Amino acid sequence: MYKVYGTRICLYCDKAENLLKTKDLPFEKIYIDEDDDAKDYIVKQGFKTVPQIWLDDNWIGGYDDLV
């Protein structure tokens, strides 16, 4: 399953979600602006932008990497 870490106001987060929906791929969207633990995880990984996307335990990258 894909995990998309993003924020509520993020064009590329929405694009990633729409792409996964279009391809009928299962995903979970995690809003780091509402979940402090998720935000801490992303910050500790060194990421400064969203979306950050994983497939199972494998990091994919951002939207451009997903495409």
Describe each region flagged by the PLM:
Residues 55-67:
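Non-catalytic, surface beta->alpha helical segment in thiol-disulfide oxidoreductase systems
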Residues 13, 36, 60:
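Loop/helix-junction capping segments adjacent to catalytic residues or to phosphate/diphosphate-binding pockets
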Residues 1-28:
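Local sequence-structure signature of Cys/Sec-based thiol-disulfide redox active-site neighborhoods
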Residues 15, 37, 65:
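Residue-level recognition of oxygen-bearing side chains
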Residues 17, 46, 63-64:
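Short, flexible helix/strand-to-coil boundary loops that buttress conserved ligand/catalytic motifs
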Residues 31-48:
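Thioredoxin-like thiol-disulfide oxidoreductase module
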Residues 51-52:
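ATP-grasp fold ATP-binding core
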Residues 8, 31-33, 63:
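Residues at the C-termini of beta-strands that transition into short coil/loop
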